[in-house]
Amino acid sequence: SVTFAAGEAEKTITVKATESLPMNVEVPLELRLDGNASVNAYAQKMPVASLIVLKEDYEVVSHGVYTNQWTGEGCNCVLQYSPTLDTYRFVNPFGTGVNVLFTYDATTHFGTSVSKQLATGFVHPSEGNVYAKPAALNKNGNNVYFDEANKIWKIGHQWVVAAGSFGADIDTFEVTE
């Protein structure tokens, strides 16, 4: 329960996940104002905030610079690993809240994207939304490769819009720490 003092407009709440909350399962959470609360006399419905709680076990593997070949720009990025899912992810490499998830085989140094298509958040001026699809780097269809000697990850993406493809490029993630 949260109460507001007269004239107070904001409150901070903390939601803690219990040990029994399953890993990697989205759990819906709704915050509702009490039906008796005086919020807006003209409102037809009381305000509701809907959230998703997600308990994850991703750990930071490395920090680096992710260079996106679509824009040609690099950004600071984090590579994480989930032991539960046995999956890696580059966190927010396009600057749009989208993560690049992939599996990886340390013996071959190759990996494969989990997602078949990513919404990059990029918009082409005449073609619209730009999506990234995995683009194979080898004959087995893997689109992720780690060059261990140079500490550089290579990620093959095909850049697609509704009308077709702009072709494939290789994004890079250079490990800095």
Task: Give, region by region, the residue ranges found by the protein language model.
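Beta-sandwich strand segments
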Residues: 36-49
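Short proline/glycine- and polar residue-rich coil/turn motifs
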Residues: 2-10
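Short, solvent-exposed charged binding patches
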Residues: 26, 46-53
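Residues at beta-strand starts and edge strands
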Residues: 9-11, 25-27, 86, 151-153
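Contiguous beta-strand segments of beta-sheet-rich domains
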Residues: 11-36
